[in-house]
Amino acid sequence: LLNRLLREHKQDPDKLTVLDRLAIVGKSGMGALTYYPEQSFSEENDNTDLDELAFQCQKILHTEYSDKLDELYRLGGTSGGARPKIMTTINDEDWIIKFSANVDGENEGKMEYDYSCCARKCGITMSETKLFPSEVCEGYFGIKRFDRISDISGTKRVHMLTAAALLELDFEQPSLDYHILMKLTKIIT
């Protein structure tokens, strides 16, 4: 997504240094790390139509042109992961809202929401989840940002790292099982 955005802004992605790319991530990335000076390509836009953003994500996944590239990048283009997502604020609360990928069924959001409710009923502590409404599917899965903690003194960023990133694995290639994840957890805690 970043490379497409750079090309749209007449910049060659191959000529950017690692520091240039970190400046583009700026303060929009997941976790506690932020990068200064920040370089931004897009303006703030509070008009978030989830169905339209999901449609634009599908166009990009199918390597088609999207006229919402700036907005999609600003809302979550640095977050990575297996599925397209946005990071947005709704009613003064920070949320991650996920859209379906090419390999998903059209009601993946509802299924993930149901699993989150099941996990909570089983006693698993996790961030608040919500099924955001849609006119084209059963809804989009949302989870309150788990890399932010809010209290009376404000919002603090929380360090986080995925197992795939820590082990330098391709998240698209299944290579971990629970035994490895438990060993990793024991090593780092």
Write out the residue ranges for each language-model feature.
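Phosphate/dinucleotide-binding and metal-coordinating scaffold of catalytic cores
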Residues: L1-T189
